[in-house]
UniProtKB/Swiss-Prot annotation:
Transmembrane segments: 12-32, 62-82, 111-131
Gene Ontology CC terms: plasma membrane
Keywords of this entry: Cell membrane, Membrane, Transmembrane, Transmembrane helix
Localization terms from the record: Cell membrane
Source organism of this protein record: Haemophilus influenzae (strain ATCC 51907 / DSM 11121 / KW20 / Rd)
Membrane recorded as keyword: yes
Protein name: Uncharacterized protein HI_1127
Amino acid sequence: MLHAKVVYDSSLHFLGFIGGIFAILGVIVLPITSGDTAFRAARLQIAEIFNVDQRSLPKRLLIAVPLFVLGYFISTIDFSVLWRYFTWANQMTAMVMLWTAAGYLYRYHKFHWVASLPAWFITTVCALICSTTKLVSA
């Protein structure tokens, strides 16, 4: 509960009432949409690997229900452990995408710095996360 109070107090103090409400909604909505996207992506990837058509509801549930059960058991793990991996994976995805875009722009003689500089920055962030965060407990 302490984290919720910190978010509430700091959002209202720094952003005012309206900005604070938007910030608090963002803290609630963004993790929910990330979870929704993760479940959808996992379901579609599994369906593609096993060639399961996803047009009918029963076939969607065939894959979704086991994923939800797995998600339930994962949610019983300490949130700080889950968050550690989520933030790392999120930053790594951004880094790979930025370097891919930078490579594409460079190859076709476009202004690649628009992607290269942020890619360099996020690579530094990822390196710092990996060096300062204990991703695997000993």
